[in-house]
Amino acid sequence: MADPDVLTEVPAALKRLAKYVIRGFYGIEHVLALDILIRNPCVKEEDMLELLKFDRKQLRSVLNNLKGDKFIKCRMRVETAADGKTTRHNYYFINYRTLVNVVKYKLDHMRRRIETDERNSTNRASFKCPVCCSTFTDLEANQLFDPMTGTFRCTFCHTEVEEDESAMPKKDARTLLARFNEQIEPIYALLRETEDVNLAYEILEPEPTEIPALKQSKDRAATAAGAAGLAGGHHREAWTNKGPSYEDLYTQNVVINMDDQDDVHRPSLEGKAAKERPIWLRESTVQGAYSSEEMKEGGIDVDTFQEREEARAGPDDNEEVMRALLIHEKKTSSVTAGSVGAAAPVTAANGSDSESETSESDDDSPPRPAAAAPPHHHRDEDEEDEEFEEVADDPIVMVAGCPFSYSEVSQRPELVAQMTPEEKEAYIAMGQRMFEDLFE
């Protein structure tokens, strides 16, 4: 049986008390947030965001401030959506018993501070020197008093001191407590009215409830969305039927023909007009650099060069630059062959000339393969053949008087069973010897 003194509904006095306190000591954001919690017992954070239209960071700052002052409490609940996903939500509510205790504590703390300030601000005389700005209290009056003149003079500059008006207490300092009690009297009256109120646990720790205004707006939005879906369903179905097919979206057909590449590119090249060659390719930029005598001394095969140039497309018959490069190449090759074949001593001057010519030819001519490369290639092939022959040697093992290769016997265990004891010992000894040779 429920206690008749326990209230199952929040009294109006408690709601007015919360409104008075929040409007007297907090800003407008805190007032709006607490008004929602006064009208609704327990509100989710997302619902408060939708009602107040605050930024999430701003709303959390306001709620954390109220929660730090013990005006509201927070409860976290884990909810499971229709798709099975769990989410955490914060629910805020007002614990009115804690609210009353916090208001009493803060008001008492303010009253005690005012009394302390009033007690400390007694009317004690204070003196100040107008020249050196030294200050003195009433306890130092015996040091300041001059019996000859009957005035108070500074102990440093002997100037007559004046009473410090800035150190005087405020005119309303003694009436501050009376003004405080007068202004806070409505809150005191509400506290006396709610002194013996006993609230039920369902009021102190309420369960989450749905806000009617938000529920109606959600229902209207769902109804409008359903009506729009029914009205536009036919059009969407027709649009989807007319849409393209994406079955072959990732299907690509690529044909690679390596034999007929020239035939494929020839029509495109034939359709384009041949570009005119620049003058520095048609005519030599070096006039008279090399004469016919130098070409003869260099041993250049002019006929071979001309045949090669005629085979190429375009007017490259009289390219002096290519001839100069060939002259350098032939000169370098002839000097190298003559020095190696004749083994004749060469002076330092000739050596310097040949080095300069070689450096110039290396800069201008393309690299040439070495003459000793083919013998080296044959030697590598001979070494590979010898290694192959060494690896190919397979020892012979006797099985019942018949010769078999060692690898064949290793792959066929039934041959081992046909061996005589002497043949088996020879087979085992050969395997051990091959194993030792392998790791030496």
Swiss-Prot record:
Q: Where is this region: Disordered?
A: 333-395
Domain HTH TFE/IIEalpha-type residues, every copy: 14-104
List GO BP terms, alphabetically. Answer: transcription initiation at RNA polymerase II promoter
> Where does the record place Low complexity bias?
333-353
Could you tell me which residues carry Phosphoserine? S268
Q: According to the UniProt record, list the residues that bear N6-acetyllysine.
A: K67
Alphabetized, the UniProt keywords read:
Acetylation, Metal-binding, Nucleus, Phosphoprotein, Transcription, Transcription regulation, Zinc, Zinc-finger
Residues the record lists as N-acetylalanine modifications: A2
Q: Name one Pfam family in it.
A: Zn_Ribbon_TF
The terms under GO molecular function for this entry are: RNA polymerase II general transcription initiation factor activity; zinc ion binding
Question: Which residue stretches are annotated zinc finger (C4-type)?
Answer: 129-157
Chain residues that bind Zn(2+) = C129, C132, C154, C157
Q: Where is the composition biased (Acidic residues)?
A: 354-364, 381-393
**Record localization:** Nucleus
Query: What cellular component terms from Gene Ontology apply here?
Result: cytosol; transcription factor TFIID complex
- What's the family? Belongs to the TFIIE alpha subunit family.
Q: What does this protein do?
A: Recruits TFIIH to the initiation complex and stimulates the RNA polymerase II C-terminal domain kinase and DNA-dependent ATPase activities of TFIIH. Both TFIIH and TFIIE are required for promoter clearance by RNA polymerase.
Q: How does it assemble?
A: Tetramer of two alpha and two beta chains. Interacts with TAF6/TAFII80. Interacts with ATF7IP. Interacts with SND1. Part of TBP-based Pol II pre-initiation complex (PIC), in which Pol II core assembles with general transcription factors and other specific initiation factors including GTF2E1, GTF2E2, GTF2F1, GTF2F2, TCEA1, ERCC2, ERCC3, GTF2H2, GTF2H3, GTF2H4, GTF2H5, GTF2A1, GTF2A2, GTF2B and TBP; this large multi-subunit PIC complex mediates DNA unwinding and targets Pol II core to the transcription start site where the first phosphodiester bond forms.
This one is known as General transcription factor IIE subunit 1
This protein's gene is called Gtf2e1
